Amino acid sequence: MPTEANTYDPQRIESTAQHYWDSTHAFEVNEHSNKPKYYCLSMLPYPSGALHMGHVRNYTIGDVISRYKRMTGHNVLQPMGWDAFGLPAENAAIKNKVAPAQWTYKNIERMRTQLKSLGYAINWSREFATCQPDYYVHEQHMFTRLMRKGLAYRRNALVNWDPVDQTVLANEQVIDGRGWRSGAPVEKREIPQWFLRITDYAQELLDGLNTLDDWPEPVKTMQRNWIGRSEGLEIRFEVRDVDNNALEALRVFTTRPDTLFGVTFVSIAPEHPLALHAAKSNPGLAGLLTQMKQGGLSEAELKTQEKRGMDTGLKAIHPITNEQLPVWVANFVLMAYGTGAVMAVPGHDQRDQEFANKYGLPIRQVIALKEPKNQDESTWEPDVWRDWYADKTREFELINSAEFDGLDYQGAFEVLAERFERQGRGQRRVNYRLRDWGVSRQRYWGCPIPVIYCPTCGAVPVPENQLPVILPENVAFSGTGSPIKTDPEWRKTTCPECGGPAERETDTFDTFMESSWYYARYTSPNAREMLDKRANYWLPVDQYIGGIEHAILHLMYFRFYHKLMRDARLVDSDEPAINLLTQGMVIAETFYRKNPDGSKDWINPADVNVECDERGRITGATLISDGQPVLIGATEKMSKSKNNGVDPQIMVTKYGADTVRLFSMFAAPPEQSLEWNETGVEGMARFLRRLWTQVHHHASHGPATALDITALDTAQKAIRCKTHNTIARVEDDYGRRRSFNTAIAAVMELSNTLARFDDTTTQSHAVRQEALETMVLLLNPITPHTSHALWQTLGHPETLLEDLPFPKVDTTALVRETAILAVQINGKLRGTIEVATDAPREHIENNALTEPNTARFLEGLTVLKIIIVPGKIVNIVAR
């Protein structure tokens, strides 16, 4: 009859292990170790109030790596903190009528408890929240330093403005051109904002990607494209008004000066000074510019919006032909990119062509294939030239370009560059798509920007001895503006330079500021300065883990801020992380019912009964509450919008933390999407119960004697061989391949093999002991609670398994004295034989021919020849 001790009870097992880890401060580390350091970090969470399965997968991956590295002799740091500022707290404050700070700290308490219930090997003594003044004071100090160096500056920039709520909206708060809360049409408004000169580091950020050998190529490609280095010419176009008066010249950057003779108009942004000048005398244009101020600023909206424009009446003078080209305002030209002006070549640019077709503007072909394959390719048409451009192997030449006809791209580039530079009409330029980082946010729940505005002295950085500028937390928050803007006691101050009356900046930092350097603060969380010498012990991060959706913004700013800290002599390294792992999404089935208006009510999978075919595919579904059918949607990323999330806490309560951890590592490789499947979770629970039973059954037969590897029989040697083969596979899977699913599969194979092993002798018992100890240690990084308990069941004192060495391969155990060969007749498997690895051919042939099942199939046949693949197959050819 099973006793409490030998029954697999996850809650009891996990509580015991976690108490031991907490009481012994098992995962607190310092820099005074003779072991090599290893810093493993998963991206810090936003304290939304509840962990989701994406969190569980992310942090379990990090925990597996951390525990494995500690077992391989490393001094491992795995910290945790909270990315605590941000818009969701403001939205929750409006909805729940609580201060953002109160909501945030309550959520942190809940999520910390959830993380601890999963048994992560986190050094909690280094924990912080980015909304704490003793964290953001250093961020403010860094900003004032950047101001003095000229790397932080203020200029006007466009924002999304809600005229009803009187507030700035983030791009994601603009829905179909309207404010998410008020429903009012959103306006584009220019207001002063603070920027960091990330463009000063553009080339270094680009070059640094070549040193990141252990970052995924897709991430590096996305960053290269975002930085967007391009070489071209900046060309000067003289401009004249309707009365032929000269105006300020237009500067246009182009990577394709070879298309210059194809320019039929020039496009400028609605905010361009020339557009504003022309609108003064053109009411129709002024009205259009006002309309263009409405709508969001996101790239997605700008790409999908209808292309609109108007002729300003101004003329740009072609720098070679002197042709007067109309200057058009176009809503797809952005003032923030390049010079806010584009030379339009509708003959060889799809966007320009769509605009030209809409407004009846000329289209000219100025590039042709040197060697067209057929008549169709000789005839210029939009679809044809798009095909040309797609085929990078084809050669082109200029046509309809006066004396430049016949030149290829490079030839035309060099000739035109030399000509324009000589005439003072242009110059070679390297341009970057990357723009300076706008760090101002017109929101309350963020780090205050440490600047004072004085009528006499202008913008003055807050002196170091007056930092931090603390954000008041006990405020009434309505959502119609920031409380600190209307708090005169907080806002009004004195100028640190002249002593006169002044006001504080009421904008707060973009929350990417906090998440751009948090990893460094973990290394010295109690330092008086931003960082101390401990930072150079731990940095760079050895393993960073997070979703690929962070490839552009967070990971770019993460790299940029590290270089700022390096240049401030706070860190020695050039890059913040050596290895980056981007885990896949957690996806799940979706279910819904249609409403009369065509909308969908999404139903959580936990509320649905499903029917499956023999392959496990869902064929039908009904709602548990009423038994009526529901529709089956696609398998999609777990999200609130599709109501297909699974609460990790429910799973931990039902199955135990180790089962949840085991499934999240077994269901898919880390970089691939993981499809949540509770049937799979149940399978992992069965495996852990089976392992628990295996160990307890073995232990019930008493302690094992010492293993004598010189006195083993064939079966015992086979088990040892399987055990040490498993060690080799799992070590490679954990260490080099990061393939945790195959590591688990290897241990499962060993468990199944061991279940068929008959250990009636003391040596067999010792062989089984070694195999079980090996399985417990191999699984420890993934199922640490279960391993903690089973290690004691196997006769060892309670200890921290991470301080035990990871199992080592005994290469002598891998040498097999016998081999099992498949026996085939005419290519079909008919039996197996076991022979000595050095058996002569005649012995192998005789054993194969006399194997009972093989002999039965050979009756009445004549053996023509026997083919032996050493160590694998015996194929008998007969007829």
Swiss-Prot record:
Disulfide bond residue pairs: none
Chain positions of motif 'HIGH' region: 45-55
Annotated protein name in UniProt: Leucine--tRNA ligase
Database matches in InterPro entries: aa-tRNA-synth_I_CS, aa-tRNA-synth_Ia, Leu-tRNA-ligase, Leu_tRNA-synth_edit, M/V/L/I-tRNA-synth_anticd-bd, Methionyl/Leucyl_tRNA_Synth, Rossmann-like_a/b/a_fold, tRNAsynth_Ia_anticodon-bd
Entry-linked HAMAP family: Leu_tRNA_synth_B (MF_00049_B)
Spans traversing the lipid bilayer: none
GO annotation, biological process: leucyl-tRNA aminoacylation
GO MF annotations, alphabetized: aminoacyl-tRNA deacylase activity; ATP binding; leucine-tRNA ligase activity
Pfam families, alphabetized: Anticodon_1 (PF08264), tRNA-synt_1 (PF00133), tRNA-synt_1_2 (PF13603), tRNA-synt_1g (PF09334)
Subcellular location(s) per record: Cytoplasm
Annotated catalysed reactions: tRNA(Leu) + L-leucine + ATP = L-leucyl-tRNA(Leu) + AMP + diphosphate
SUPFAM superfamilies noted in UniProt: Anticodon-binding domain of a subclass of class I aminoacyl-tRNA synthetases, Nucleotidylyl transferase, ValRS/IleRS/LeuRS editing domain
Lineage: Bacteria, Pseudomonadati, Pseudomonadota, Gammaproteobacteria, Lysobacterales
Tagged with keyword Secreted: no
Binding site for ATP: K640
